[in-house]
C-alpha cells in the first residue's frame, strides 16, 4: 500500500535481544530516541504509576515508540490497569520486579535521572493517584471494586 510502519513495539527488539526489564527500555531511549531526557523522565513516571496502581501487565508489548520527524519517542501510554499483584512483569532495576516505589527511587540513576528529579516525579504521581477514590465514585465504579483496591493503593501511597 505504500505506507510505512512508524511505530515500534519494545517487544520487537527485546524478543531478539532477550531483554527483560525497564532498563532495556532505558537503553533503547539512550541509543535511539530524540528528546532523551524527556523520554527517560516519562518512562520513569510510567514505572512509578504502574507501581502505584499495581499494574502488573507492564510487559514489553505494552510499551511502544513512535517515529516522529525528529526521531523516535515514547508512544502515549496504554493498557494501564490496576491489579492486586505485588510484582511487575518487568524488572524495575537489575534484579527486582517487586512493586515498590522505594526500589524505583533507589534505582533512579539507572534511569539516568537525578534523585531530586526522581523524587519530584514520584511526588507528582502520588498526588495524581491520591484522588483515585473520589474519581472512582464520580465514574460510578462499583463500591465492591473500590473496596477491593483500597488496600492496594494504600500500600503504595
Task: State where each predicted segment sits.
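Anionic ligand-binding catalytic core segments
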Residues: 1-157
Amino acid at each position: 500500500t505504500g505506507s510505512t510502519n512508524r511505530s515500534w513495539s519494545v517487544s520487537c527488539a527485546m524478543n531478539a535481544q532477550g531483554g527483560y526489564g525497564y532498563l532495556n527500555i532505558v537503553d533503547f531511549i539512550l541509543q535511539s530516541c530524540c528528546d532523551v531526557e524527556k523520554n527517560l523522565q516519562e518512562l520513569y513516571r510510567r514505572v512509578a504509576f504502574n507501581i502505584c496502581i499495581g499494574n502488573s501487565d507492564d510487559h514489553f508489548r505494552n510499551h511502544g515508540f513512535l517515529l516522529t520527524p525528529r526521531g523516535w519517542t515514547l508512544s502515549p501510554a496504554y493498557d494501564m490497569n490496576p491489579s492486586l499483584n505485588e510484582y511487575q512483569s518487568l524488572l524495575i532495576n537489575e534484579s527486582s520486579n517487586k512493586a515498590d516505589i522505594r526500589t524505583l527511587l533507589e534505582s533512579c540513576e539507572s534511569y539516568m535521572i537525578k534523585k531530586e528529579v526522581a523524587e519530584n516525579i514520584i511526588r507528582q504521581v502520588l498526588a495524581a493517584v491520591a484522588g483515585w477514590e473520589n474519581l472512582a465514585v464520580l465514574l460510578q465504579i462499583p463500591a465492591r471494586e473500590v473496596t477491593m483496591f483500597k488496600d492496594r493503593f494504600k500500600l503504595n501511597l
